[in-house]
């Protein structure tokens, strides 16, 4: 279990940083390229552990994939060309891989077994397996398909109109991907609109997708045609440096090529409401996935209330938003964020426990947390518990804490941001 020592940053973080490729888009580009007809070239791919798990699984199903750093070439097999895997499909730590791939496996007439690491074994799969079973897929797993390992025997599916109890892009995507080979029109309705990378990318691959309010529909029988994908930087990774730039004294950062998909930019809205000083300069207007350069500098923040429709737009950024709130004047309330409990860790409990160790005044609620600012943080030994976003949040906290902060299980950051610590060190010089 590797640990990292973080020293206080006395002279601020300064400089330009190119944010690594978006994890959600990288996963989808590989998957959609695999089931498309023709060769897909991906630039800006995130070579983190999660996305490499996706490549590994599709290679196991006979897809020819060549990865060289952040460039990937996928020779598509078409919707009907995947081969039955001879080995168990191992998704590692990747919830996106297992949930989206389940939708593809559900419509493919062969047998497969899917598993992941200890964290994946605790994450709820029934939200995906139930609708896929309703469509006609034969899926089993521990506790009637609630937990991995899962076995899937795909085949002829019928379209469904599904109302999801949760706003989850993974649930929505699994059903839509299954619907590509289902008879009829598949529709998914959500309580709030979740991230829409799947819909955008399906359209880029030539699939007609219809959006009506909180409902997304597609007709079965549509083919995907290979295309080139340019992956923008991951706003969820950018969030750590956006908050760092705002709360570390004497800082000014330029974050280049940050994905600005409106279903993902809740962090930008929150920082604006808290009073952060930043500018956003769009760089690729008209692209299916917009991006921008963002300049942010040390700011005086104030506490706010965060809840409702914005939560799906910033669910992965809540750990670092909580850190920002410890440095804001007044009280910040985060609510309606039950989904935090079923991430890589229970992020409500983990954020509260680890920030409390550093001296923050923060308490857990059933659906979020209450943070009392402004707190002077003090260095301590903390733990990521294998959760990449907790690890990065604690590293930024260590930059403003008095004395050194030791992060246990720090290598978890490699899931989404392999060069995170090197970038942090470079900007602190």
UniProtKB/Swiss-Prot annotation:
One of its GO terms (molecular function) is 3-phosphoshikimate 1-carboxyvinyltransferase activity. It comes from Bacillus thuringiensis subsp. konkukian (strain 97-27). Phosphoenolpyruvate binds at residues 23, 95, 123, 170, 347, 389. Monomer. Pathway: Metabolic intermediate biosynthesis; chorismate biosynthesis; chorismate from D-erythrose 4-phosphate and phosphoenolpyruvate: step 6/7. The keyword ATP-binding does not apply. This is 3-phosphoshikimate 1-carboxyvinyltransferase. Its EC number is 2.5.1.19.
């Amino acid at each position: 279990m590797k640990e990292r020592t973080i020293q206080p940053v006395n002279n601020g973080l300064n400089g330009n940083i190119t944010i690594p490729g978006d994890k959600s888009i990288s996963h989808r580009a590989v998957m959609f390229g695999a089931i498309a007809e023709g060769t897909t070239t991906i630039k800006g791919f995130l070579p983190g552990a999660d996305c490499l798990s996706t490549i590994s699984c599709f290679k196991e199903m006979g897809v020819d994939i060549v990865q060289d750093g952040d460039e990937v070439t996928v020779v598509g097999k078409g919707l009907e060309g995947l081969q039955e895997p001879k080995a168990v499909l191992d998704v590692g730590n990747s919830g996106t891989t297992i949930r989206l791939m389940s939708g593809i496996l559900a419509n493919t007439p062969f047998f497969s077994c899917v598993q992941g690491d200890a964290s994946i074994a605790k994450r709820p799969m029934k939200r995906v397996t139930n609708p896929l079973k309703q469509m006609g897929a034969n899926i089993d797993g521990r506790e009637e398909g609630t937990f991995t390992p899962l076995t899937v025997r795909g085949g002829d599916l019928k379209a469904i109109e599904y109302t999801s109890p949760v706003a989850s892009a993974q649930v929505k995507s699994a059903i839509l991907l299954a619907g590509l080979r289902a008879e009829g029109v598949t529709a998914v309705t959500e309580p709030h609109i979740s991230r829409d990378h799947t819909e955008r990318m399906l359209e880029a691959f030539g699939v007609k997708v219809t959006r009506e309010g909180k409902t997304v529909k597609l007709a079965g029988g549509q083919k995907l045609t290979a295309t080139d994908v340019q992956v923008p930087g991951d706003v969820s990774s950018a969030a750590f440096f956006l908050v760092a730039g705002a709360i570390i004294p004497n800082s000014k950062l330029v974050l280049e090529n940050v994905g600005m998909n409106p279903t993902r930019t809740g962090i930008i809205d929150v920082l604006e409401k808290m009073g952060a000083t930043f500018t956003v300069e769009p760089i690729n207007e008209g692209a299916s996935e917009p991006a921008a350069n963002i300049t942010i500098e040390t700011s005086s923040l104030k506490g706010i209330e965060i809840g409702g429709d914005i939560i799906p737009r910033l669910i992965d950024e809540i750990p670092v938003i909580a850190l920002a709130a410890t440095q804001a004047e007044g009280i910040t309330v985060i609510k309606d964020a039950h989904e935090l409990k079923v991430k890589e860790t229970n992020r409500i409990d983990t954020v509260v426990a680890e920030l409390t160790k550093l001296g923050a005044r923060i308490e857990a609620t059933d659906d979020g947390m209450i943070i009392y600012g402004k707190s002077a943080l003090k260095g301590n030994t903390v733990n990521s518990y294998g959760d990449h976003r907790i690890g990065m949040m604690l590293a930024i906290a260590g930059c403003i804490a008095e004395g050194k902060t030791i992060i246990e299980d720090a290598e978890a950051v490699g899931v989404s941001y392999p060069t995170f610590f090197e970038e942090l060190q470079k900007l602190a010089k």
